[in-house]
Curated annotation (Swiss-Prot):
InterPro entries: MFS, MFS_trans_sf
Principal subcellular localization: membrane
An example Gene Ontology biological process: response to antibiotic
Name of the featured protein: Uncharacterized MFS-type transporter YvqJ
Source taxon at top rank: Bacteria
Gene (UniProt): yvqJ
Pfam families (UniProt xref): MFS_1
Keywords of the record: Cell membrane, Membrane, Transmembrane, Transmembrane helix, Transport
GO cellular component entries: plasma membrane
Entry's family note: Belongs to the major facilitator superfamily.
Native organism: Bacillus subtilis (strain 168)
Molecular function GO labels: efflux transmembrane transporter activity
Amino acid sequence: MVNLIESDSIWKRNFNYLFFSRIVKISGDMFAFNSILWFLIYDGKGAIGTALLIAVTFLPEAVLAPVTGPFMKQTTLKFWMYFSDLTRAAIVLIIPLCHFAGFSPLWFVMTLMIVHSATGAAYNPASIALIPQIVNEQGIQKANAVLQSSAQIVRLGAVTLCGAFLTFISPSYTMLIALVLYLVSGFLVLFIKYTAVESQSESAVVTQRGTYIGRLKRGFRLVRKHQILYPLAIYCIFMNFAAAPWEALSAVYVAEDLNGQPIVYSLLKATTAAGAFLLGFVLAKVKVNRYGLLFVTAGIIEGFAFFITGMNTFLPLVFFAAFTFGAAVSAVNVPEYTIIQTSVDSEDQPQVYAVIHMISNISIPAGAVICGYAANAFGSGKVIAVGGIVEIIAGIGILLFTKLAKAERSDLIKEREASVHL
């Protein structure tokens, strides 16, 4: 299943700029989201308020990603990323300024977070599709793993540092740090220079893909008919539905069930990031042949981590489960991105990623709203544990009844060649 990756360096000019832009942007995201999260908690909104925040954070991005995908050409990917960074910078400036002026009702903050989320519909598909343009095919998995592991180290520092700021100063002042980070990230993206990579089989067909509507439909058709991506998308739905209770209720779980302070929540997130970094580092050193098997296995392990976390309040065991959950995150994201980049031609990658992202992430806001009310009735821990059970059962089903876990790298390449003419 795995072999050591050859030592060809991916650290060249374009990847360096992408690398630093991504880690700075992730830092900005951490500061922005956690500041608003604890603002709602301090304001007495509790589980329902945080659940609504999760809903408006994920839903616009998920819905709009397929809509913006057909506009993305290989030559304009970095400009979509730049636009996203500038828009998010504006959002994190408006919220604290209005709060200082005495105007910060919940509906206003939620509206701005909808816009904040919508920009992800451009940034994420563009950044995923950009990697094969600046890294050779043999280095794609390594590039994904390096970005994933480094992102977790940044989260480790950013979440902990943000927790410290939130403990001593207000969330509004903490958000101003995110403003600077978003501006720096957007500035770095502009230095990326590349020539669009287009295969011979692709160039002969790409002009026949039609208008905007045709490209929009093509993205959904590719996912539906793809023997690897279709079960991947289905399992993503269950994975995100299972993750919704943790995403929506983890802060409330720490505050109410564990009687912890914001710094405990931040340390728990930091432990998760450490687990993700460790496995991301390993995946940067070994070459995986069966990405689907790694993806499904990681999902099942993630489900067990949710179950363990929700069923007990013994803090050391909760931290161990958080570390395991973090490791599973890398083991899910790296193969998911690599499967898309390997089994779909470059012109279709932004749209295919956007479609899978939409299909899977629709379950997050729905699950977040449901679990917010369920937590009031049954408790946050039990709801988190139920999410883990859902993910375990779904993973076993995907493992037994689909081709996802059986596919090797050669199968992904065959699917890519077939998809060009679809």
